[in-house]
């Protein structure tokens, strides 16, 4: 990977930092995709899970002390991290530590994002960091956190919020900020109904990415103060940040200053929090030159690597031809006399003869029966698609059996097909 010229100073900053990834959220807007897994454990991009992106950003940035706070249906997330992220070397104080809600300080689960960090304050303190990086575990992006940390130090900030411009119609789902010319935050409102536009850029708001850097001692003091506040919901966006903005040195960091290898000059960051956004972000990857470059060897996305054979395409007859066009097909897949167009197939998917898949996202271990036709669908892990099933052509009929978004993207799960699968996904 490419390293900055002043590597020594960056290395010292990252060595003295610890990252805390908040990975306990359910992600209810993903509907049945999160019935059996936390949002950070949802598969993405053919072979990854969403959690792999912030974890990879940490490792690639030189941050090798990482805590992952888990809560909601965490088993698949825990298994994934244990199987795929055991390569850090404890002899050099490198680790990924899983931090489930343990009721360490009182008899309650994590009550909010700030409380999730507060309940692990003793663990964080034991590592004696200078800086604490707070990350969400449910966004897809590539960011050099070393540059974020360096910016935080250069501004003598007590807290730094990574930010990005979003259209006003999308900004209501995030924390929205107003800032001075030098980037100091003057106002912060969590999920406002009417977001404030960026001066000089009508139609856009400056929003928080849910990525924060704190001076460690400052953070610990603020977490204790917030914990003792009976009126607080113990959330960074709702409580902690609005309290700090008028009282402390809170600055922003533009994502464009630390986004890694931008393809089109626009930083890529996706909150794949709805079925439609998830479908769109996956299918973005089948473009000739996608905005998210998964083939970037300078900034690899690390994950659990299953030992799988290559994808196979069989039959080349006039009436059935195994082929995939403008698509990504992962290891272990067999396209047997079927046609796949503009689709993304995760590992171990079998598509049987005479079937057609178009604009579809197929998660691992799916078996598509003969003569099936799937269009604009997301198919969850382990589904067995019956022969001849058609989905994506009649929204009225589809809604009787599956979940269909307003724009006609259909989610199919084993339960919707009457298939009971009683294990983690």
From Swiss-Prot:
The encoding gene: glgC
UniProt binding sites for alpha-D-glucose 1-phosphate: 110, 175, 190-191, 208
Protein name (database record): Glucose-1-phosphate adenylyltransferase
InterPro entries referenced in this protein's UniProt entry, alphabetically: ADP-Glc_PPase (IPR011831), ADP_Glu_pyroP_CS (IPR005836), GlgC_bac (IPR023049), GlmU/GlgC-like_hexapep (IPR056818), NTP_transferase_dom (IPR005835), Nucleotide-diphossugar_trans (IPR029044), Trimer_LpxA-like_sf (IPR011004)
HAMAP family tied to this protein: GlgC
Subunit details: Homotetramer.
Keywords: ATP-binding, Carbohydrate metabolism, Glycogen biosynthesis, Glycogen metabolism, Nucleotide-binding, Nucleotidyltransferase, Transferase
SUPFAM superfamilies per record: Nucleotide-diphospho-sugar transferases, Trimeric LpxA-like enzymes
Pathway the protein contributes to: Glycan biosynthesis; glycogen biosynthesis
The protein's enzyme class: transferase
Keyword Nucleus included in the entry's annotation: no
Pfam family, one: Hexapep_GlmU
Lineage start: Bacteria, Pseudomonadati, Pseudomonadota, Betaproteobacteria, Nitrosomonadales
Organism: Nitrosospira multiformis (strain ATCC 25196 / NCIMB 11849 / C 71)
